[in-house]
Regions:
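Extended, low-polarity transmembrane helix blocks
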Residues: 1-34, 58, 73-140
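Perimembrane loop-to-helix junctions flanking transmembrane segments
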Residues: 38-53
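Membrane-interface loop-to-helix entry segments
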Residues: 55-62
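Core segments of transmembrane alpha-helices
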Residues: 63-68
């Protein structure tokens, strides 16, 4: 007889794929163990060259590893999503505007992040709640 899978099994798979993906791609920014194809356009090449020469990409890659690790850890997955969200948006914009070949990966990662975020919606609900009484100006 086949046992039923736990209810959160799809979330665990999504966390594993997204977390390992960002850990691997983040670590690759430091260790260069995976070949990275060069950008197709000259503007994309100079853009990435500038980001790399300033050390900006090292910070982004470290944040990718941190976010991926938090997602894999489980309990702090919402914090990992908060870290990775802006990175995913920037990767998507780069792919849309400069180099389309990475778009399928970022779409899959974005869908996984949205799925995980939806399953943790209770952690994100306060961001969307308006607390007008805390925002009033009490001047002289």
């Amino acid at each position: 007889m086949v046992e039923k899978l736990p209810k959160n099994y799809p979330v665990a798979i999504a966390k594993a794929i997204l977390g390992v993906g960002f850990l691997v791609f983040g670590a690759n920014g430091f260790l260069h163990f995976l070949p990275v194809p060069p950008p197709v356009s000259a503007s994309a090449q100079s853009f990435l060259g500038l980001l790399d020469s300033t050390g900006y990409m090292k910070v982004v890659k470290a944040l990718e590893m941190l976010g991926g690790g938090l997602i894999l850890g489980g309990r702090l997955a919402p914090l990992g999503l908060l870290i990775l969200g802006p990175i995913l948006v920037n990767i998507a914009l780069y792919d849309l505007l400069m180099d389309l070949k990475g778009l399928p990966v970022v779409l899959v990662f974005g869908a996984l992040a949205l799925f995980i975020g939806y399953r943790h919606k209770e952690h994100f609900a306060p961001f969307f709640k308006v607390h007008a009484e805390h925002c009033t100006f009490k001047g002289k």
